[in-house]
């Protein structure tokens, strides 16, 4: 018997999970690396504050405006192929963004934003397709992974820029995750297939629960998702949360440098405290404690409000509210999309509902950095 055959099912399942989480890491690294480098980038390219704010708004604007198109692309290509498209566009955009000119910075950022827009739909669809029985856990891991990679990028982007320049640092924090994630994605989620690789499904035991939900095809039962009141309630809530998050996270490193005399690296780490622990608490609240959705969302909102209140009243005490709002930010994202996936009867309904919510939320959020700047 080969060594591969002797691996337990849990080990094979973990390989599939790692392949998915590697993809999730790419969804935030290309965007999260820019705020701590914004001062250097703006100085070298001669950008004013408005241009810098516009640059940080480009990906979020893409997430909003391009989501309807991305939804059609995912439906046309399928989940696995669309995920590979995300990785390719992120890599191409990052290389162009680091070319060292203003137009390249904006053009590359648009390409990155367009690619990640597709990925923002792919990730919850993979969870709904392959991990629907552990939705809260996998959505929490998805959100937490995004925030961990942002933490690493913001902590190390400036030190790396001191060695290889901001262009090299910005490119590295996309290229390395993309290449690693791409290798795993090709192995675990082969293009052209609507499920993980068959041999992995069989060895992991996943074949027992990956059923007709894997098919990304239209469903006609019930009203269209955009006619459902619950869809718009979730869209408005997501819009408010993303506006607040991107408004503060887009400029928090710069504000901490100016107001508290922190180093650029220290400011990046402080800003990246937003959202690591929270997502992991979502499966605890939903599954272990069995809290209803209303209680979960109420606790999350209370934690989030601590940050704007503290920044207005006592900005020198930023650490605790940053941690509380970080818990809230990550937890809200995970909780919201857990509800979306659970309430979707198929992967296709998941895609359409997510598209409505993200279009609304990110269009509102895109003006956050400019307004707060």
Task: Explain the meaning of each model-derived region.
Residues 102, 133-134, 141-192:
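Helix-loop-helix hairpin linking two adjacent transmembrane segments in secondary transporters
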Residues 347-373:
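A late C-terminal transmembrane helix in Major Facilitator Superfamily
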Residues 66-78, 280-293:
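Helix-to-loop junctions at the C-terminal end of transmembrane segments
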Residues 34-35, 229-272, 279:
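Extracytoplasmic gate region of multi-pass secondary transporters
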Residues 292-336:
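C-terminal transmembrane helical hairpin of 12-TM major facilitator-type secondary transporters
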Residues 65-103:
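Conserved MFS/SLC helix-loop-helix module at the cytosolic interface between two early adjacent transmembrane helices
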